[in-house]
């Protein structure tokens, strides 16, 4: 049985950050409004049914001051999204702080697996990087090209209503991210804001500095890779950060800590993330098996890998699981930053990838 055609639309937004947000909100209005109910009914209600939508939105206001302090331009974008979609700002804050709010809800919808390779590991020496993003079924997402007046253009993919942190920019920087589970969270900058801020940097060193110096609310893994062959992985927590350098010009990551001093604090196996160890091992195994031959089309096949199904690199929905655990890969992205290209697909086992260019 063949894969389904990929008819994804690439949305393009330009101007000031407020204008970009307004265009985003207008273009994706129906989806953004639908996602408010999605987050409440599909994500939070199964785990914390006693918490109302109004309470979630009120809690999300805690992100306003951290965002204004560290990334005021994205506060403008979020306000623009609310204006364009015709919804209260608190709804947009709730959607963009959903991963932070989710810390209090013990739900598992599958784990993300990311990778990067360059130099001798790749067929042509160019950097290739990407990931699968796993979440619960029903989440809407979109491919976007963002061209701000005052920074690099971005090409990426995001859940509708959220900022873009999965993709690349026109300076040759790619950024990807994986959830981590750590015993502490604080009132800080939401991970989506940190991710888009990193993706908006003109170089790997500046992206690294941005991630390291922004006070995050929860633990998150950031993988950044550049057209010149620089790449690094940063495991961020509210307390301290761990840094992982390439091994044989390859980095792979899933949803557990790899930095030795952070591993004792890892809680991945306590909230259904046990498969993270197998996914990371499998991705590393595939990349080592094809060392020196790695390129975009081949790594896209890795992202289709179903070993360990339904919780392999490409997660598949299992209707027999409880709703609170039922998830899978909702989108997949592969980038070659030197070429300014991204290949994006819904679940790649079921759909073809579609190529987009900055």
Regions found by a protein language model. Give the residues of each.
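Internal mixed beta-strand/loop scaffold within catalytic domains of large alpha/beta enzymes
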Residues: 97-192, 209, 330-333, 342-344, ...
């Amino acid at each position: 049985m063949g894969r389904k055609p990929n008819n994804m639309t690439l949305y393009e937004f330009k101007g000031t950050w407020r204008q970009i947000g307004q265009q985003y909100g207008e273009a994706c209005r129906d989806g953004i409004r639908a996602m408010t109910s999605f987050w409440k009914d599909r994500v939070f209600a199964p785990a914390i049914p006693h918490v109302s939508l109004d309470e979630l939105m009120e809690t999300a206001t805690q992100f306003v001051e951290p965002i204004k302090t560290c990334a005021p331009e994205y506060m403008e974008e979020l306000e623009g999204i609310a204006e364009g979609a015709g919804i209260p700002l608190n709804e947009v804050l709730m959607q963009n702080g959903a991963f932070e709010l989710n810390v209090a809800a013990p739900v598992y919808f599958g784990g993300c697996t990311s990778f990067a390779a360059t130099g001798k590991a790749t067929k042509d020496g160019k950097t290739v990087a990407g990931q699968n993003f796993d979440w619960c079924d029903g989440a809407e997402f979109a491919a976007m090209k963002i061209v701000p007046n005052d920074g690099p253009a971005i090409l990426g993919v995001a859940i509708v209503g959220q900022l873009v942190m999965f993709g690349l920019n026109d300076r040759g920087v790619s950024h990807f991210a994986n959830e981590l589970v750590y015993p502490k969270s604080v009132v800080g900058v939401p991970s989506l804001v940190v991710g888009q801020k990193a993706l908006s940097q003109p170089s790997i060193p500046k992206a690294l500095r941005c991630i390291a110096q922004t006070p995050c609310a929860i633990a998150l893994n950031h993988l950044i890779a550049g057209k010149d062959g620089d790449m690094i992985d940063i495991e961020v927590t509210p307390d301290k950060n761990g840094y992982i350098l390439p091994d044989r010009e390859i980095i792979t990551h899933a949803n557990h800590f790899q930095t030795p001093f952070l591993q004792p604090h890892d809680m991945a196996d306590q909230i259904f993330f046990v498969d993270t160890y197998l996914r990371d091992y499998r991705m590393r195994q595939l990349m080592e098996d094809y060392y020196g031959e790695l390129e975009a089309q081949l790594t896209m096949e890795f992202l289709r890998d179903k070993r360990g199904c339904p919780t392999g690199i490409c997660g598949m929905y299992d209707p027999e699981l409880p709703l609170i655990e039922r998830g899978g890969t909702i989108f997949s992205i592969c980038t070659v930053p030197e070429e300014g290209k991204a290949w994006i697909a819904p679940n790649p086992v079921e759909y073809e990838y579609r190529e987009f260019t900055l």
